[in-house]
Swiss-Prot record:
This is HAT1-interacting factor 1. It comes from Saccharomyces cerevisiae (strain ATCC 204508 / S288c) (Baker's yeast). Its main location: nucleus. TPR repeats lie at residues 186-220, 229-262, 289-322. The modification Phosphoserine is found at S174. Present with 4550 molecules/cell in log phase SD medium. Residues 85-97, 105-116 have a biased composition (Low complexity). Homodimer. The homodimer interacts with a histone tetramer containing H3 and H4; the interaction is direct. The homodimer interacts with heterodimeric histone H2A and H2B; the interaction is direct. Component of the nuclear histone acetyltransferase B (HAT-B) complex composed of at least HAT1, HAT2 and HIF1. Does not interact with HAT1 in the absence of HAT2. Interacts with histones H3 and H4 in a HAT1/HAT2 dependent manner.
Amino acid sequence: MKLRAEDVLANGTSRHKVQIDMERQVQIAKDLLAQKKFLEAAKRCQQTLDSLPKDGLLPDPELFTIFAQAVYNMEVQNSGNLFGDALLAGDDGSGSESESEPESDVSNGEEGNENGQTEIPNSRMFQFDQEEEDLTGDVDSGDSEDSGEGSEEEEENVEKEEERLALHELANFSPANEHDDEIEDVSQLRKSGFHIYFENDLYENALDLLAQALMLLGRPTADGQSLTENSRLRIGDVYILMGDIEREAEMFSRAIHHYLKALGYYKTLKPAEQVTEKVIQAEFLVCDALRWVDQVPAKDKLKRFKHAKALLEKHMTTRPKDSELQQARLAQIQDDIDEVQENQQHGSKRPLSQPTTSIGFPALEKPLGDFNDLSQLVKKKPRRH
């Protein structure tokens, strides 16, 4: 059968053949991730992405999400983070320890320095150090008694105010009527040289890979088309993954930003049990990160905690099948409510740098499919520095 011109790539390869091979590589990488062979999974994704033809065949977004999870878990292994919850494909929730191999020590020399390196995507997500969020805009503007203490204090106050304003705008974000400026045109997509993602800060590398997955999932917007239900669902799932990585890296405000973005996408979907569960999960994760953001006033934390508590209680009356998980979440949120109320009376006793507990990390069992967080029923104590 003679192939049509549009079915043949510039190098003479069948477009269909390349697509089939890419799907096979995705499945292999997913299996490696499930086996906790993080370096092998990451290299499989890197080599697949670098080998794709550059003339119009777009990568499967899942190559980027698997790559991101593998790189993230390599960093967890490198840092000896005993409290880090891995983002795994096919995690059965058993909580069994991985037989970690020394595979996370990557040699940069193995890949070599390639010619023709393309620029890293111009992702806006890294602006959030100054553009992070808070839950409300109507916040008292500080108790600064030492006016003129120095430019550092003034800059810090400006950043806090920008954070408050940014989150106030984001709390009601909906992609149905607002442009998502984190989803850039695919022309910004990296084309080759993916070995760089084994270097430097692997947390940020994982986030950048997820940002590229967003470019691919959101690409219909460049043609003025509406995103499909499935695309919005998968974009929401990518934002959850971003939030989980940021939360584990103690970038709590950035995590809240992306959990709220996920909520914005989930709330545009048609009502369904899966959607309801994702909304519940995202609401809980906002609270899980929020407890560590000191810039948010206690009254606004209480609003969010009580909102999540009411959602959980309502959900538990109609969905008893996962009541054990929801009970654990409910107990944690009630603890948060009690702590905020106690702090209002007696002042905070929590060290500023304590990271969060982790209930609800997602696991990919199929392309950005259902999240499996049943392994997180035991509430862990935050690690201390």
